[in-house]
């Protein structure tokens, strides 16, 4: 009898202990403000099927977070723990059910044994599909004088799975950069390798070629690429790049070109298609991109400064020239599409939307390498009206830089240092039929605060990909080190 009594007493004490330390909200005190969460997902717009927007609540002495998400068109889910960690399948089902609707998020936290409930906030589910498997990007550790650890990576946007495409641990001492697929289709994939084993890699339908890094007739490497929509051509700039360092606190690194030109490459014939209009003396042409119909080549150009001390006087305009894909020939004149120099600014990273309506670009004070320019901001040019405007709805006080469109032209991915001012993160925003953008959201992570606090990598040159990139990295590493290269020739 005594044994039974002791067991019963222990059970009562245990039950009282559980009641005294409840894991879910009870008698929560209302707080007249929304929660401070990381990442800031309050009021963002997301696509159906995106990875769960897990978040932490910022504040001292918070030992429990309870989050309930309710759909305006039905459905709900619940997370309870150290942070809001939602089930992937349940999240997908909820976003699918509420396409074009909204999610209401109720957040409670436990502090000092008491529960607090914040005001609800909304997450909007876009009516526009993402239509992409994921994103590709370069992830690079800080380093100024040598090529530190970096690699090209891909991330499934429906979950948290990341995989390396090619990592420079497999080719030590080499810099991997400037990758691009064709309208988000990785069956045509290109990137540049800089270093002692430099090359330009072009992969078409699984077949790789390593082009000589430099053609003596070009005077520089094949660097910034962009595919023709037909896949028959790839535009490049040829850059003699130099890196410098500022002594001003907010200005760290400067990247400039001693010279650069633009040309189109034909992979089938290994021919470089030049034109004197794109290789002008005393001018630098850079960052070429094709229009969605393939009949126009956009690029940026600036007057070179003979005195390198005057690098802040190098400012780029946006230009265009006609291109005939059937003949592989250019038009007979160049037009200035946007005069940034007249504004005292410099334009970089032009990216036309695939529906042909808009052109996204970055505006900075000088130069073209905007990643470290705190003043850099994104602009949108309406190709039908010629009007351009700063994207105030997505810009921040810190560097907002490189960007790309998804295939249906309703989503963009871009880099920004708005999080901490030091590291570039990936952000996504949707755009409607009138060119209006929604509040951006940061790339979701399973453990967001832990991931971004502990990460020493910046994300840059992001692009969408409609399927996983297939790339045999081990074979490719051997090919890089072998220095076997395919030569290129200038078309007569």
Predicted segments, located by residue:
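Bacterial Sec-dependent N-terminal signal peptides
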Residues: 1-26
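Sequence signature of WD/YWTD-type beta-propeller architectures
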Residues: 21-492
């Amino acid at each position: 009898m005594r044994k039974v009594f002791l067991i019963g007493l222990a059970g009562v004490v245990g039950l009282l202990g559980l009641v005294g330390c409840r894991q879910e909200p009870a008698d929560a005190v209302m707080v007249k403000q929304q929660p401070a969460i990381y990442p800031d997902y309050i009021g963002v717009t997301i696509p159906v099927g995106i990875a769960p927007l897990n978040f932490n609540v910022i504040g001292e002495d918070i030992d429990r977070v309870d989050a309930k998400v309710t759909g305006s068109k039905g459905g709900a889910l619940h997370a309870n723990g150290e942070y809001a960690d939602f089930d992937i399948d349940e999240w997908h089902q909820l976003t699918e059910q509420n396409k074009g609707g909204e999610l209401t998020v109720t957040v409670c936290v436990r502090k000092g044994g008491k529960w607090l409930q914040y005001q609800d906030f909304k997450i909007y589910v876009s009516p526009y599909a993402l239509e992409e498997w994921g994103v590709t990007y370069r992830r690079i550790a800080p380093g100024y004088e040598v090529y530190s650890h970096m690699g090209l990576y891909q991330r499934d946007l429906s979950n948290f799975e990341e995989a390396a495409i090619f990592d420079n641990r497999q080719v030590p001492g080499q810099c991997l950069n400037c990758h691009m697929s064709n309208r988000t289709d990785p069956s045509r994939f290109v990137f540049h390798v800089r270093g002692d084993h430099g090359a330009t890699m072009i992969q078409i339908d699984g077949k790789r070629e390593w082009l000589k890094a430099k053609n003596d007739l070009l005077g520089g490497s094949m660097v910034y690429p962009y595919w023709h929509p037909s896949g028959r051509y790839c535009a490049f700039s040829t850059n003699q790049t130099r890196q410098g360092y500022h002594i001003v606190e907010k200005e760290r690194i400067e990247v400039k070109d001693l010279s650069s030109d633009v040309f189109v490459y034909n992979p089938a014939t290994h021919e470089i298609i030049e034109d004197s209009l794109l290789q002008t003396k005393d001018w630098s042409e850079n960052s070429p991109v094709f229009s969605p119909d393939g009949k126009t080549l956009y690029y940026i150009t600036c007057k070179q400064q003979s005195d390198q001390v005057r690098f802040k006087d190098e400012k780029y305009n946006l230009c265009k020239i006609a291109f005939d894909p059937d003949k592989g020939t250019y038009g007979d004149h160049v037009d200035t599409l946007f005069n940034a120099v007249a504004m005292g600014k410099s334009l970089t990273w032009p990216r036309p939307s695939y529906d042909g309506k808009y052109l996204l670009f970055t505006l900075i004070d000088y130069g073209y390498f905007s990643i470290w320019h705190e003043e850099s901001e994104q602009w949108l040019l309406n190709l039908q009206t010629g009007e351009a405007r700063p994207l105030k709805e997505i810009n921040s006080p810190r560097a907002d830089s490189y960007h790309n469109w998804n295939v249906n032209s309703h989503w963009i991915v871009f880099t920004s240092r708005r999080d901490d001012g030091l590291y570039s993160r990936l952000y996504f925003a949707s755009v409607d039929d009138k060119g209006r953008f929604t509040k951006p959201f940061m790339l979701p992570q399973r453990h967001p605060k832990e991931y971004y606090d502990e990460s020493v990598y910046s994300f840059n040159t992001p692009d969408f990909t409609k399927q996983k990139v297939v790339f045999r990295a081990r074979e490719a590493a051997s090919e890089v080190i072998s220095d076997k290269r395919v030569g290129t020739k200038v078309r007569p």
